[in-house]
């Protein structure tokens, strides 16, 4: 028995039949949220934490060379405080306007769906496959866990400090690094090799080589 790995977080209800939106934290949503899948709902006694670098449990990886469909579960977020766990079974799931909608067994109306809001959805770390690079033909790509990336300092090739990686966003179009700026606000940087050529957890930093306009916030 491994440790819980977060694959999603329940958002607001959708409609009146019990559907909920899910903030996906996995690159394998079609597998993790397929009908019949069983997920453990983790509810914190206190406020939910933001994704953290020291999240427990193994996780599938994201890679600088990987795009949509790369194998992985983030494992980068978990609830703060003693969790209360229950098992939810997926009845149906579908994409709607770029968001994943999920219906769970026994959740049949909007009130029941609202009661799930904010819950973390987890799987056992033993269910996570080995880290692989699915789209690097030369097998020389590198893969990184979310927990390896969050907390790293970001700088340009010239050495200018951009901030610190505060989150890894798993979107249908690929992974995005949220970099917190020292002066406030965030940069959103696509996690692809052309833009993030260097990831060095041992040195505590990444190098971001932004194309024109990427870091313009105005």
From Swiss-Prot:
GO cellular component: cytoplasm; ribosome
Predominant place of localization: cytoplasm
Keyword rRNA processing carried by entry: yes
Key words of the record: Chaperone, Cytoplasm, Ribosome biogenesis, rRNA processing
Cellular localisation: Cytoplasm
Domain of life where this protein originates: Bacteria
Domains as described in the record: The PRC barrel domain binds ribosomal protein uS19.
Family: Belongs to the RimM family.
Functional description taken from the UniProt entry: An accessory protein needed during the final step in the assembly of 30S ribosomal subunit, possibly for assembly of the head region. Essential for efficient processing of 16S rRNA. May be needed both before and after RbfA during the maturation of 16S rRNA. It has affinity for free ribosomal 30S subunits but not for 70S ribosomes.
Protein name: Ribosome maturation factor RimM
Biological classification of the source: Bacteria, Bacillati, Actinomycetota, Actinomycetes, Frankiales
Gene: rimM
